[in-house]
Amino acid sequence: MNFIRNNRRALIQRMGLTVTKQICDDLFALNVLNNQEANVIYCEPLEQEAARKIIHMTMQKGSAACNLFLKSLENWDYFVYQDLTGQNLSYQVTEEDLNVLAQNLKDLYNSPAFLNFYPLGEDIDIIFNLEKTFTEPIMWKKDHRHHRVEQLTLGSLLEALKSPCLIEGESGKGKSTLLQRIAMLWASGGCRALKGFRLVFFIHLRSARGGLFETLYDQLLNIPDFISKPTFKALLLKLHKEVLFLLDGYNEFHPQNCPEIEALIKENHRFKNMVIVTTTTECLRHIRHVGALTAEVGDMTEDSAKDLIEAVLVPDQVERLWAQIQESRCLRNLMKTPLFVVITCAIQMGRQEFQAHTQTMLFQTFYDLLIQKNSHRYRGGASGDFARSLDYCGDLALEGVFAHKFDFEPEHGSSMNEDVLVTIGLLCKYTAQRLKPTYKFFHKSFQEYTAGRRLSSLLTSKEPEEVSKGNSYLNKMVSISDITSLYGNLLLYTCGSSTEATRAVMRHLAMVYQHGSLQGLSVTKRPLWRQESIQSLRNTTEQDVLKAINVNSFVECGINLFSESMSKSDLSQEFEAFFQGKSLYINSENIPDYLFDFFEYLPNCASALDFVKLDFYERATESQDKAEENVPGVHTEGPSETYIPPRAVSLFFNWKQEFKTLEVTLRDINKLNKQDIKYLGKIFSSATNLRLHIKRCAAMAGRLSSVLRTCKNMHTLMVEASPLTTDDEQYITSVTGLQNLSIHRLHTQQLPGGLIDSLGNLKNLERLILDDIRMNEEDAKNLAEGLRSLKKMRLLHLTHLSDIGEGMDYIVKSLSEESCDLQEMKLVACCLTANSVKVLAQNLHNLIKLSILDISENYLEKDGNEALQELIGRLGVLGELTTLMLPWCWDVHTSLPKLLKQLEGTPGLAKLGLKNWRLRDEEIKSLGEFLEMNPLRDLQQLDLAGHCVSSDGWLYFMNVFENLKQLVFFDFSTEEFLPDAALVRKLSQVLSKLTLLQEVKLTGWEFDDYDISAIKGTFKLVTA
């Protein structure tokens, strides 16, 4: 009792929570502590408080209890006991004894038993040698946010080693091999960072049992007799950081089996030995809080994969295999995981030719290898039972994929022969310290393959019941987003397993596109490639945008299924039904190999696509050479000097048919030579209808005319922020078949004979957009003259034109003085005058097909209100009006009553813009009353920016505003407006009811953090 009293402070500080609870177990078993007292200790989360309580309880029970306490302490924490009793035995181990132990470990780590290992498990007789097959991994240091902050090599990791060091990575990333390599380097004596360690222990945590001493004895070597367990513990305590533990596979470790190792990791500050632990990312959460250094094993580099292949295969096999990998981006991607490199090598072993072109082939070979290698281990059952067990394994995997389940309990396998599946390795059984065993597939992707294999067999079965069962699984896939995100791999392996199964899958996917859903909505027909900003999406709902993105992924999914199926042209009809009417986006810098097969074997499908978009970007010539080495049909001598990838030329020019529509975008290209232009011409020739977009291309100055000469079927041209010469502009106006022309941000001075002067030559032009172009009044007059000749024009945008004087008077007159078919007119920020508006009003009867009229961002000076009222009074002739965006002038708010009267006849209005109308409370109430009596049910955009409304006025308006259920965007911006609390609360309630909102502009509203928190939602909120 005196001993405990004298050492009470040290005991409280050093015992630790694990040891305290172990001592509590002993004292409870010996009836020193009763049930209530033991529960007090078990429920105490603080280690020092738990130690304080158990010491107090023990001392109250007398000397006998104290003696039992010390005996238990000696058993569970010998280090502390030896220190406190003054019986430290470290002196009993001499330097010579320590050297003998270290040499024994080094001999082990240099022995074939340690260096030779089974990369696919001991059941598969394929052996790799650590010295010859180890390749340097890429690792990433993680910060406290668990973000990657620094790339590490093995050497830099060891130099910066802190304990505990946690190494995370998914299965198959080579974590175990990494620890074995560290042990081998220590044994060799050639690693400077490891020379400070006197002892290094490599431990497989999955088979750790008993204490630390017993585990080392079982796994590594016979520890010399002169080193007893107490002596060994004292030795570890003495050496501190001179001992390194390499603990492999915490994800397979059961702490109950070896509490000392658990304490070595989680209470490392007590042991002070260095520890490196590997675990899967999923299990990292159990130990991340104690890690002093966390590193993630990343992807295997291409060079490392090649080194590994060269180390395990003979030279002629390496050459054939590497050639196949270089031809397939799919295989190159799989080679980032060491496990798949090993499987690929295993496939090649014993074969004359490498055949693994697909992911399915890799898994199929591995699956068959498991069956072949291990089926002989199954004894005592009929062959039919064996086959049924395999089928049930597939059913288990299939049900798991649909239930998103990857761990299985015994009840899930009630009708299967578990011995068969566990014996041959299809399932792994986990039983240690479990009331019920758990079954898992060795890898999530392998479960998906097993499921796909089973689904394929069901769909191609001769038994109607099995076919019906297979179709029932397909019928669960009714959402495009689910197919692309949840079931993509399942379908990939299904199609890779059977051509007939592919036929069934593609028929189902075609039906999903026609009749399926995305979050309960029918599939959109929007162009799939378009990634537009929120400003240009205000006519659409959020669901529309989401559907477009998912349908684009759907097309990519279809092409991947074609590639995986290796069906070539056998299923041409089924694939054509799937691709009919869809769109495809291609990045010229990343053209996958399967597209060449797609164009070659399914030309009817490529022709069935409505739209193909191809993008070109500026690129360095050095970076492209490697990508061009394997371009089919292209032979180059020396470094390439072209900026258009020959791979793109090969794909499009060698194709024997034509696309319906091809859109080519040239972006940020600063150099373009004659060969590039020739290449573009070859690509352009593959389309019946060509669209050419040029964005920020300095190389186009003086070369656009040459590029356009190669375009025989160009119907659309868009030029943005790219300088043009007079010759370029003249040639544009000579392309008489042009239907759509867009010019943006052209700041060069208009020269005689240029684009503006000759625009009238484009007789077939239907859409014209001129945005931010340098013009003067004389240029505007010439433009007006040219517009008279464009009789087929349906859309005209003239935006952000300055310094054109009264030029808009001439332009408006030329557009409206005769009856025409113009459907969309945008004259935004273009010096529109009151006279222009008057002319437009007087001639509005000639524009009766107008559905979009946007003349916003124009300030009408003299007689502006009169002109605007005249225009408003004649709006009734526009029976198809859906968009109305008006200019402003002095006292423009007085025109609101007349406007509201006219809007009674336009219930289909989708956009209304009254920017800078300086609406007051009176006007906003009038607008609210109008919307209450004449609800614009289709209104999607409302712009009332530049108002003078008070909080009371907005409160009144909000009661009606919340009924605009289709609203996508609104702008109520103003200057220095402080909304009161009641308005903020009401606004928050209204916004929560407008579920389709994408963007809200409230610039000038002086919100604090509480206000922002109340009104924010899934939409974009702009307040500054």
Curated annotation (Swiss-Prot):
Question: Is Repeat among this UniProt entry's keywords?
Answer: yes
Q: Where are the transmembrane segments?
A: none
Per the record, GO CC terms?
Answer: cytosol; intracellular membrane-bounded organelle; IPAF inflammasome complex; plasma membrane
Quote the disruption phenotype from the UniProt entry. Mice show defects in inflammasome function in response to S.typhimurium (Salmonella) infection. Differences are however observed depending on the strain background: in a C57BL/6J strain background, no striking differences are observed compared to wild-type mice following Salmonella infection. While in a BALB/c strain background, mice are highly susceptible to orogastric but not intraperitoneal infection with Salmonella: enhanced lethality is preceded by impaired expression of endothelial adhesion molecules, lower neutrophil recruitment and poor intestinal pathogen clearance.
Stretches forming LRR repeats: 578-598, 656-679, 735-758, 762-785, 787-812, 824-847, 848-870, 878-902, 911-933, 936-963, 965-985, 999-1021
Q: Which InterPro entries match?
A: CARD, DEATH-like_dom_sf, LRR_dom_sf, NACHT_NTPase, NLRC4, Nlrc4-like_WHD, NLRC4_HD, P-loop_NTPase
What are the start and end residues of every segment in region (Winged-helix domain (WHD))?
A: 356-463
Where does this protein chiefly localize? cytoplasm
Q: Where is the NACHT domain?
A: 163-476
Q: Write out the ranges of the annotated region (Nucleotide-binding domain (NBD)).
A: 95-298
Q: In which tissues is it expressed?
A: Expressed by intestinal mononuclear phagocytes.
Modifications the protein undergoes after translation, according to the UniProt entry: Phosphorylated at Ser-533 following infection of macrophages with S.typhimurium (Salmonella). Phosphorylation is essential for NLRC4 inflammasome function to promote caspase-1 activation and pyroptosis. PRKCD phosphorylates Ser-533 in vitro.
The chain residues annotated with the modification Phosphoserine are: 533
Q: Which GO terms describe its molecular function?
A: ATP binding; caspase binding; endopeptidase activator activity; identical protein binding; protein homodimerization activity
Q: What is this protein called?
A: NLR family CARD domain-containing protein 4
